Amino acid sequence: MIRLFFLLFFIFDLGAETKVFVLGSGTPNPDPERGGSSYLIMVNKTPYLIDFGAGVVRNFAGLTSEWGGNLEIDTTSIEHAFLTHMHSDHTLGLSDLIITPWIMGKTESLKLHGPKELDLMAKNIIDAYDFDINYRINGTQPQNSTGYKYDFFEIYDGYVYQNEEIRLEAFKNSHGDLEKSFGFVVTTSDLKIVFSGDTAPSEKLIKKSKGADILIHEVFSEAGFLKKTPDWQIYHAAHHTSPEQLGSIANTIKPKKLVLSHILYWGATESQIKMEVAKYYDGDIEVATDLLRIH
């Protein structure tokens, strides 16, 4: 234990404060109350994004003091973004993430971490906005020529990003037959946070999540699932997690807080979803909503 303490002392800033927010709690379904899947980890004044679904930059802005929030930063401070997998509900905000902070004055390149296909997506977005980028740089707008660029880092099973504030480890989860789909274990000096990503029950997730302070896990409505046609039931059972399965997972991991997010409601309410999971798990459960501060 003493050895571990000194190891953490040299790795992390032990005076750091970690804040965790839900930016977007939604799914592919166009729910006007829920943005595309995205989360924010703040360590001191450094933001780290997990996924970037539709509305990511605007929801990020909603947490800043400029727009009535409590964070003394702005969108130009976004430097690192990590992607769990390439599905559209997790990536539709990428063009916003590349372009908008630059328009607002960002000069440093974005650090994109994700499956190798993300690199091609980002290149294609920049190509698609070539006219707008050239107009802003070479027209009368006093715009810099660097802030829309990005550096790419490929994520794989076991990938680790680490600096003096944070350690992020990627692990392969079980999202149907999608080979490059990951969950993340994020460790700071004061928190261990696990993001399930989109997944059916995953033994690797359970192994990686031991000792987690916060487990952010996807789930679907039990009642809604029973109303689905057999073909959709087969699909969702292979790609996602039921309340009973999540209860079993949480009972094994025993996180200090279980956050239900990326919820396939299928007509259920937030309280009904919480009750469905609470039938199988009696720990601290919170239902994610956009701009929720988890910690």
Give the ranges of each region predicted by the language model.
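Sec-dependent signal peptide recognition
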Residues: 1-7
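Hydrophobic h-region of N-terminal signal peptides that target proteins for export
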Residues: 7-16
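Binuclear metal-dependent hydrolase catalytic cores
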Residues: 16-194, 272-295
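Cap/insert and terminal regions of metallo-dependent hydrolase folds
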Residues: 12, 183, 189-192, 200-292
